[in-house]
Design a protein with these regions (language model features):
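N-terminal extracellular/periplasmic Venus flytrap/periplasmic-binding protein-like
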Residues: 11-12, 22-23, 27-31, 43, ...
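Flexible glycine-/small-residue-enriched beta->alpha junction loops
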Residues: 105, 111-169
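Active-site pocket-lining segment
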Residues: 168, 204, 212, 283-354
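Conserved catalytic cysteine-centered active-site region
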Residues: 24, 56-112, 144-147, 157-163, ...
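Active-site-proximal alpha-helical scaffold in enzymes
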Residues: 87-118, 171-200, 262-269, 334-335, ...
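Condensing-enzyme catalytic core mediating Claisen C-C bond formation in acyl metabolism
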Residues: 1-24, 145, 231-297, 301, ...
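Conserved active-site "lid/cap" helical segment
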Residues: 1-75, 82, 166-178, 188, ...
């Protein structure tokens, strides 16, 4: 089996819901990091890209009809370059990286772009067609997040818990207290705030310029979601979202956000042919299923499966990027894997609670941030892992070079 190298990676800033990126279409947002990679590598023959793999969770609005293909054309890649869009909900971007890696490892392709996008702000409302003449039972769904067009058989078998309800289910089943969740959230905010103040993410981010009104264009170059001024006292005042009493609040859950990320993946032959500098190697990806009502625990079996395949144990990882869908599930996963709640090598620069969670983008961001983190902090081996709605988990192992 052949090696798969990550040669470069960039992302947009993560926009707050209704924030600075609200006017940017999802396909234009996806094109932005691809354009940035093209600008960084002007001598690369971009017609040699074998495939663009992009993750996107919604696909009900401007991200419809294969946003990967739309984005690569908007970015200026030759129309001879094909593109495919993958959907594993929250793990779509990580799956795109994994799919590209598998294609390279198998020998089917040599050079790929992989990434993910989500504009949750611009997610549309949708309505199904009437099932009978003169029907007055039409339902309208907000596609920003959660269930729509529910299959009654699936509902009868597994229920249709909303995402915050799954966070409560995990908190209850794995005995994660409200106090522990709020402490976890504070750490995420503080770490992200410190990283932003130090300019840590500047090397990851490609600025987005948005046409303005009389004031002219606006350049967005920083993540908008973090609230480093958050206090435990402030979090304690927030009411639970779905249960009373409950533990999951807006303060200890991930955000609803906009963003995109992309990376160049290459075989050893492509690295040499195109004069690329490999930064890291993808060692493998694993996925696993869990009961939908506790979808947040998905990273545990996925990580265990990956570790067994690679002959690794959790202590072998110098850095872990764990998507913080909810503090409850983040803590539960860490405890199940034998990692301390406050481990400084898990999300050392904040996670989705602080930075935000643009669904299809987040997995690609985790992989990107893992590579960047090893280069900055040191360490050889990183794990990127995340839970997935309807009960799944995905994990990827990445090895730093040099």
């Amino acid at each position: 089996m052949r090696d798969v190298f990550i040669c470069d990676a960039v992302r947009t800033p993560i926009g707050r819901f209704g924030g600075s990126l609200a006017k940017v279409r999802a396909d234009d947002l996806a094109a932005a990091p691809i354009k940035a990679l093209m600008a960084k590598h002007p001598n690369l023959d971009w017609a040699q890209v074998d495939e663009v793999f992009f993750g996107c969770a919604n696909q009900a609005g401007e991200d419809n009809r294969n946003v990967a293909r739309m984005a690569l054309l908007l970015a200026g890649l030759p129309d001879s370059v094909p593109g495919q869009t993958l959907n594993r909900l929250c793990a779509s971007g990580l799956d795109a990286v994994g799919a590209a890696g598998r294609a390279i490892r198998s020998g089917e392709i040599e050079l790929a772009i992989a990434g993910g996008v989500e504009s949750m702000t611009r997610a549309p409302f949708v309505m199904g067609k009437a099932q009978e003449a003169f029907s007055r039972s039409a339902e309208i769904f907000d596609t920003t997040i959660g269930w729509r067009f529910i299959n009654p058989l699936l509902k009868a078998q597994y229920g249709v818990d909303a995402m915050p309800e799954t966070g409560e289910n995990v908190a209850e089943e794995f005995q994660v207290s409200r106090a522990d969740q709020d402490a976890f959230a504070i750490r995420s905010q503080q770490r992200a705030g410190a990283a932003i103040a130090a300019g840590y993410f500047a090397e990851e981010i490609t600025p987005i310029t948005i046409p303005g009104g009389k004031a002219g264009p606006i350049t967005v170059d920083k993540d908008e979601h973090p609230r480093p001024e958050t206090t435990l006292e402030g979090l304690a005042k927030l009411k639970p979202i779905v249960r009373n009493p409950g533990t999951v609040t807006a303060g200890n859950a991930s955000g609803v956000n906009d963003g995109a990320a992309a990376m160049i993946l290459a075989s050893e032959a492509a690295v040499k042919k195109h004069g690329l500098t490999p930064r890291a190697r993808i060692l493998g990806l694993a996925s696993a299923g869990v009961p939908p009502r506790i979808m947040g625990i998905g990273p545990v079996p996925a990580t265990r499966k990956l570790m067994e395949r690679l002959g690794k144990k959790i202590s072998d990882f110098d850095l872990i990027e764990l998507n913080e869908a909810f503090a409850s599930q983040g803590i539960a996963c860490m405890r199940q894997l034998g990692v301390a709640d406050d481990a400084d090598y898990v999300n050392p620069h904040g996670g989705a609670i602080a930075l935000g969670h643009p669904l299809g983008m987040s997995g690609a961001r985790l992989a990107l941030t893992a590579v960047h983190g090893m280069e900055k902090r040191g360490g050889k081996l990183a794990l990127a892992t995340m839970c997935v709605g309807v009960g799944q988990g995905v994990a990827v192992a990445i090895e730093k070079l040099n």
